[in-house]
């Protein structure tokens, strides 16, 4: 009885599990959206999808024109953000 409970390989798990119809591959094919979203959720989901697409292109895309900003540019950008958000510089980074 314990032998059938503790399966050793994913193939055995797929065959013997009652959840085999909902394997990882099958669940990945399901859409990640809710069926009935209100306007706020649709707006937030659209923002999430656009940010995810942008992140994927930044991480995996090949852009030969991209030049990493220098330390001075990054420091200036951080100082401008701190001033814009009206936060004191706490010195913790």
Curated annotation (Swiss-Prot):
Transit peptide segment: 1-25
Residue ranges, annotated region (Disordered): 30-93
Localization annotation: Mitochondrion
Tagged with keyword tRNA-binding: no
Biased composition (Basic and acidic residues): 35-93
UniProt keyword annotations, A-Z: Mitochondrion, Transit peptide
Cystine crosslinks: none
Induction of expression: Induced under aerobic conditions and by mild heat stress.
Coiled coil feature spans: none
Chief place of localization: mitochondrion
Annotated GO CC locations: mitochondrion
Anything else known: Present with 937 molecules/cell in log phase SD medium.
Protein name: Protein FMP16, mitochondrial
Biological source species: Saccharomyces cerevisiae (strain ATCC 204508 / S288c) (Baker's yeast)
